[in-house]
A protein has these predicted regions:
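Conserved active-site and SAM-binding loop architecture
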Residues: 1-181
């Protein structure tokens, strides 16, 4: 039987790509692909793992200066997406699961993360501190110097900027897959 992995809010598919490459059945659910995690219905078969990356716009500390201007409703909408991810995890009871988000206020709602990392910890030479909650084996680190620094804030304003900032680093995606097949 083919193993299934759910990939939630992973528009780029970068985090789940190692599973696709290894022959897993990866079900990607993302609003930008026309599927809303808040409306996702339980699958009628076992799910081995769940990767969840709810949008960070309302949670990441890098955007804190805009939180007040956006108001409470945008936070409530973002929390509804994170809650939907947690509901999907609870319903499917996978062998492993992880929910990621950059350093920010999501920890106020989910508690202390299981781990935090920078892309440089897994071979990608830049920094972007990211937290993970869940039940999973921690990936083996392969640290390199972050010679590119914090390059995410240097991306020019464009319609693709948010998607580019949200791409899971390839080194981390591969290491996570190897630790959680």
């Amino acid at each position: 039987m083919m193993m299934t992995v759910l990939s939630l809010c992973d528009y780029t598919g970068a985090w789940s790509q190692p599973y696709v490459d290894a022959g897993y059945d990866v079900v990607r659910v993302d609003i930008k692909r026309g599927q809303d995690v808040r409306l996702f219905e339980a699958l009628p078969f076992p799910v081995r793992g769940v990767l969840a990356a709810p949008p960070c716009t309302e949670f990441a500390s890098s955007g804190a200066r805009w939180w007040a201007a956006k108001g409470e409703q945008s936070l409530l909408d973002a929390l509804a997406i994170a809650d939907a991810c947690m509901r999907i995890i609870a319903v499917h009871q996978p062998q492993w699961w992880a929910l990621e988000n950059p350093i920010g206020r999501l920890r106020k709602y989910l508690g202390t993360p299981r781990m935090a990392f920078d892309p440089a910890d897994y071979g990608d030479p830049y920094t972007k501190r990211t937290q993970l909650w869940g039940h999973f084996r921690e990936p083996v680190m392969c640290r390199v110097e972050p010679v590119e620094g914090s390059k995410m804030h240097l991306l020019p304003a464009s319609p693709e900027r948010a998607a580019l900032r949200s791409v899971t680093p390839a080194g981390f995606a591969r290491a996570f897959f190897e630790a959680n097949p």
